[in-house]
Amino acid sequence: MKKLILLTSKDCHLCNQALKLLNQINLDNFEFVKQDIYSKRLYLDSYWDKIPVLLLEERELTWPFDEHLIESFLKTNIKEI
């Protein structure tokens, strides 16, 4: 099972919107993890100005995104992995 990470931050209203979108999508084929951007220096250095960010393997989807972009991102990455 592939790990899908949502990078978030405390009091991030866009992150809350992203989480609501993800709750509308079937993520049964993924191990979903909500990760604070401050938990790893690499996340903070790379994505501090882009959150929310979805990470799957070595691919990323940065905000803004909607339900259709998320589904496309997941399908594309499943086919390529």
Label the predicted regions.
Residues 19-37:
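Conserved helix-turn-beta segment immediately C-terminal to the redox Cys motif
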Residues 7, 35, 58, 62:
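Small/polar loops that bind or transfer phosphate-bearing groups
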Residues 56-81:
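Non-catalytic, surface beta->alpha helical segment in thiol-disulfide oxidoreductase systems
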Residues 45-54:
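Structural micro-motif
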